[in-house]
């Protein structure tokens, strides 16, 4: 008990400090993004795009909600990119995932996409700019899908302007054919952020996020009832730049909701919510540090990180429920460009379940390291260039 109370005081003091001074609700994933877009300077030319993503993500979790495990491997994504028009790019390739210690290639995906761009707007059909590119919150859209579901197929509309980011997409997760023994699965999503103030002394924005997961269909022979699960988030982000070794202070806070719109009750809860409160700072050279406080009530998410949910996905305790969840997570991250086109990303995230009695609280943690290589090589030069 003597060790618990000082820890409680330290955590409580830290929360007060970072919430008062103001961080990014999640670790920035800029280095993980790789977008191929039409380019007027490359019209008529053929390129080979190479995207290599090496990952090690380890969960030292011992709770009843999310398993402890390690993902360790590499992904390779070679694609041919034809810049058919200043506003049009066509891509074709393949995605390979190799898990270290496993036999052969764990999984491969064909890659086809058509991308039309006009000004700040882009229409994508085929392989989406998915997972981390959606810029969604972990309770709604698990960051781990960058590894476990690296390829998404469907249609996507993106606006990336000075004061507005918008990503609206349909991810067709499971296609079925008559007569199918399983149901189709579709995920629709919206991720938007509107800048209200953006200058050298302050930036303030309002993010809105929404996912709708539907499982059903009319040509399946499964007896399972239809499911429609909705998650949404509304919040604000504030960043205050500095000129010293601390580059900026941040705060990002959300109210996240869950609603089960299914005709048949299959979930333990039909609706719920969670407060996702975050604060911290970025340094010039030493990475970023932030604190996250999660207070969930009957919260479920169709695609979110299991840790935040009130219903367990644990291999031993599946279905176990905790109506009220209260977590504190301390996040350290360091991103660095090592060479042209080569990036590294390191993360360490200890957490404590504040919903447990003081004497039984344990510090759990996750740690990750990523290495990314992103490059395009010209294979054919357009005539006259």
Stretch-by-stretch model annotation:
Residues 1-32, 157, 287, 367-385:
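Bacterial Sec-dependent N-terminal signal peptides
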Residues 24-105, 110-116, 366-375, 384:
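Beta-barrel outer-membrane channel/assembly domains of diderm bacteria
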Residues 57, 132-136, 217:
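Short acidic/His/Gly/Ser-rich catalytic and metal-binding motifs that mark active-site loops
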Residues 60-65, 138-139, 307-316:
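Flexible, solvent-exposed loop segments that connect beta-strands
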Residues 72, 104-106, 149, 184, ...:
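Short, glycine/acidic-rich beta->alpha junctions
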Residues 73, 93, 111, 161-169, ...:
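Exposed, low-structure sequence patches enriched in small/polar residues
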Residues 81-87, 95, 106-122, 131, ...:
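Subset of outer-membrane beta-barrel
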Residues 122-193:
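Surface-exposed coil loops of outer-membrane beta-barrel proteins
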């Amino acid at each position: 008990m003597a060790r618990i109370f000082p820890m409680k005081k330290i955590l409580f003091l830290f929360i007060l400090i970072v919430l008062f001074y103001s961080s990014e609700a999640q670790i920035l994933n800029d280095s993980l993004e790789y977008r191929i877009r039409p380019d007027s300077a490359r019209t008529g030319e053929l390129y080979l795009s190479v995207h290599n993503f090496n990952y090690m993500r380890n969960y030292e979790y011992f709770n009843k909600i999310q398993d402890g495990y390690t993902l360790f491997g590499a992904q390779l994504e070679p694609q041919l990119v034809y810049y058919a028009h200043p506003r049009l790019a066509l891509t074709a390739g393949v995605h390979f995932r190799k898990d270290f210690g496993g036999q052969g290639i764990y999984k491969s995906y064909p890659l086809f996409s058509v991308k039309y761009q006009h000004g700040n707007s882009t229409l994508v059909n085929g392989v989406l700019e998915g997972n981390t590119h959606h810029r969604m919150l972990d309770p709604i859209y698990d960051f781990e899908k960058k590894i476990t579901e690296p390829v998404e197929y469907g249609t996507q509309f993106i606006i990336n302007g000075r004061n507005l980011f918008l990503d609206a997409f349909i991810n067709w997760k499971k296609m079925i054919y008559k007569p199918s023994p399983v149901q189709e699965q579709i995920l629709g999503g919206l991720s938007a952020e509107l800048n209200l103030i953006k200058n050298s002394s302050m930036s303030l924005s309002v993010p809105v996020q929404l996912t709708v997961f539907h499982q059903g269909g009319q040509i399946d022979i499964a007896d399972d009832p239809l499911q429609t699960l909705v998650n949404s988030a509304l919040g604000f982000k504030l960043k205050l730049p500095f000129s010293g070794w601390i580059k900026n202070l941040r705060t990002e806070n959300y109210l996240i909701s869950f609603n089960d719109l299914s005709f048949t009750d299959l979930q333990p809860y039909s609706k719920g919510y969670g407060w996702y409160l975050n604060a911290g700072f970025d340094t010039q050279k030493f990475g970023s540090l932030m604190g996250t406080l999660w207070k969930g009530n009957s919260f479920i998410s169709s695609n979110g990180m299991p840790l935040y949910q009130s219903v367990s996905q644990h291999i031993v305790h599946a279905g176990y429920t905790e109506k009220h969840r209260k977590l504190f997570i301390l996040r350290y991250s360091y991103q660095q460009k090592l060479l042209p086109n080569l990036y590294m990303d390191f993360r360490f995230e200890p957490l404590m379940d504040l919903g447990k009695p003081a004497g039984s609280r344990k510090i759990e943690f996750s740690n990750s390291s990523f290495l990314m290589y992103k490059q395009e090589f010209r294979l054919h030069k357009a005539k006259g260039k």
